């Protein structure tokens, strides 16, 4: 028996956050996933963070300098929890004893529209 596809009215509404990341060490997409999850778990505990439906959709490496490495990413979360995710991302300041800065540069309803905020 084939499973039926959920109609749009019953699907979860997602929002996509464009993130700007500056860190003093080299990170990968998997490291960013860990950074985001640990930041949200520290601020909202596991019970609240499980509802966020966090997912790193895209990860871009922009530049490497002597002082820092610059990355940008697109993060998916549920519409109802956008403010909570942004708050927990703002509180991230260390990763592996290195300074890190994560800021939100844009918010959108689709990935295509969110890519307008990303520098390539």
Task: Describe the predicted segments one by one.
Residues 76-83:
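Helix N-cap motif at beta-to-alpha junctions
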